[in-house]
Each structure stands twice: as structure tokens, then as C-alpha cells.
Amino acid sequence: MASNVTNKTDPRSMNSRVFIGNLNTLVVKKSDVEAIFSKYGKIVGCSVHKGFAFVQYVNERNARAAVAGEDGRMIAGQVLDINLAAEPKVNRGKAGVKRSAAEMYGSSFDLDYDFQRDYYDRMYSYPARVPPPPPIARAVVPSKRQRVSGNTSRRGKSGFNSKSGQRGSSSKSVKGDDLQAIKKELTQIKQKVDSLLESLEKIEKEQSKQADLSFSSPVEMKNEKSEEEQSSASVKKDETNVKMESEAGADDSAEEGDLLDDDDNEDRGDDQLELKDDEKEPEEGEDDRDSANGEDDS
């Protein structure tokens, strides 16, 4: 396997270096690139980056043969854009236009790939005979610092502790303010909820009162009707009693009148009899007198 060194700046190395653009590095790996380009000559170095790769040949003839043979080839659904690193394409035209697999192989062989634009054109614009871009910077491991004397270390620790304490206090104050604001909001919400509950209780009480009134009203009406009926019945009874008493009094008065009439008639009869007796007595006296006169005459 070739090395990863593809950033030499000497003219010979630059003229024998091939740039491979629009490469689907999610699918194509370094071993695949070496297998494809090793047939054009010995590969000294190969580096694969995101969207592109570099292949370092021994001489310029092998590099030009690789460019002529592989430029425009489709690998993993993307058309490769290959040229010498020292001689980038000036008039690319529509080099970054996406083309489907159906255009390359016909409508019967349609691959669903999202073609990317030429990473080389977007990221780098090299004039002729310009060194390639530097490789991706590796993470630099910082060297260990020498320990300082105990006093300075203590001061540093104390300073760090003071800074951390200040940060902690500021964060605590911020948290305290946030907590107070949250408490205020919660108290407001609680007050609103309490007022709503009170209003609901009032509404329920009013509804219960109305329901009680609606239930009690027919009973009261019935009681009133029964009382009225009882009073009317008692009045009727009183009227009948009065009528009966009046009729009984009339009968008594009639009987008394009849009795009085009878007494009057009896008194009148007695008076008439007495008068008759009185009339008879003088007649008898006259008769006695007449009889006496007759005797005298004889």
C-alpha cells in the first residue's frame, strides 16, 4: 500500500501528481483508488480527502496516462473530474453539473445518486505550476509544561479557585433570580386558580339553590292548593250550617206563630162565650121580669 504523502512541492513531484475530483469518498476508499490507478504505473503516495483524492506517481508520463484514461469515468454514481495537480483545467464549462446514470448508460440503468459539484473547483483555484493544497492539519499535542515552584502553583490554584468561586456565585445569583421569578409566576398562577375555584363554587351554590327552588315550588303549590281547598270546604260547611240554623229558626218561629194563633183563637172563643153568657143573663132577667109582670096581671 502506498504512503499518504502527496504534498511534496518539488516540480517533479507536482508534475507527476494526479488530482481526482468529484469523488464519492463515502463509498470509495483508499484501497479502491489505488486499485483503479495502479494499472497506469507505480503509485508512490495516495491520500483520500472528503470529496477528492491525490495520487502520486513516479514520473509524469504515468500521471498523464492516468488522466487520459480515467477522466470522466463514473465511480459510485459520480463522474470523476481528473487532471494533473500542476495543470488544473482552466475552461471547465459545466464541469460540476450533475448527470444521472440514465444519461450515461441509458434509461434502463438508472441509479439514484446525488452528484456533487467539483470539490476541487469550489475549494481551490490553482494557477499553473502551483503546489497542491496543504493536507488537513493534524491535532497538535501540547507539550507538557515544566512544573513551577510551590508558591507560584499555590497562587495559581488560589487564583483559579477564586475565579471558579466568582463564577459559581454569579451562577448562583442568576439561579436565585430565576427561582424568584419562577416563584412569583407560580404564586400568580395559584391566585388565579384559587379565584377560579371560588367562582366555580359560587356558581355551583347558585345552581343548587335554583334546583332546590325548582323542586320545592310544585310542593308549595300543592300545599297552597290543599289549604285553599280546605278553607273553601270549611267555608262551605259554615254556609251549610248557617242555612240549616236559619231554616231551623224559621221553622221554630212558624211553630211559635201557629201556637200564638191557636192561643189567640182560644182566647177569642172564651171571650165570645163570656159575651154570650153575659147576653143570656139579662135576657133571663127580662124573662123573669116578664113572668113576674104576668103573674101580677093575673
UniProtKB/Swiss-Prot annotation:
- What range(s) does the RRM domain occupy? 16-87
Database matches in Gene3D superfamilies = 3.30.70.330
Q: What SMART domains does this protein's entry cite?
A: RRM (SM00360)
Post-translational modification N6-acetyllysine, affected residues? 163
Q: Which UniProt keywords apply?
A: Acetylation, Coiled coil, Isopeptide bond, mRNA processing, mRNA splicing, Nucleus, Phosphoprotein, Ribonucleoprotein, RNA-binding, Spliceosome, Ubl conjugation
Q: Where is this cross-link: Glycyl lysine isopeptide (Lys-Gly) (interchain with G-Cter in SUMO2)?
A: 8, 50, 89, 94, 163, 209, 222, 225, 236-237, 243
**Comp. bias (Low complexity):** 162-173
Q: GO annotations under biological process?
A: 3'-UTR-mediated mRNA stabilization; mRNA splicing, via spliceosome; negative regulation of mRNA modification; negative regulation of telomere maintenance via telomerase
Q: Where is the composition biased (Acidic residues)?
A: 248-269, 280-298
Question: Where is coiled-coil annotated?
Answer: 176-211
Q: Where is this motif: Nuclear localization signal?
A: 142-148
What residues does the Glycyl lysine isopeptide (Lys-Gly) (interchain with G-Cter in SUMO) crosslink join?
A: 243
User: Which PANTHER family does the record match to this protein?
Assistant: HETEROGENEOUS NUCLEAR RIBONUCLEOPROTEIN, HETEROGENEOUS NUCLEAR RIBONUCLEOPROTEINS C1_C2
Q: Which family does it belong to?
A: Belongs to the RRM HNRPC family. RALY subfamily.
Q: Describe its partners and assembly state.
A: Tetramer composed of 3 copies of isoform C1 and 1 copy of isoform C2. Assembly of 3 tetramers with bound pre-mRNA gives rise to a 19S complex that interacts with HNRNPA2B1 tetramers. Component of the 40S hnRNP particle. Identified in the spliceosome C complex. Interacts with IGF2BP1. Interacts with PPIA/CYPA.
Supply the name of the protein.
Heterogeneous nuclear ribonucleoprotein C
- Species assigned in the record: Rattus norvegicus (Rat)
- The encoding gene is Hnrnpc
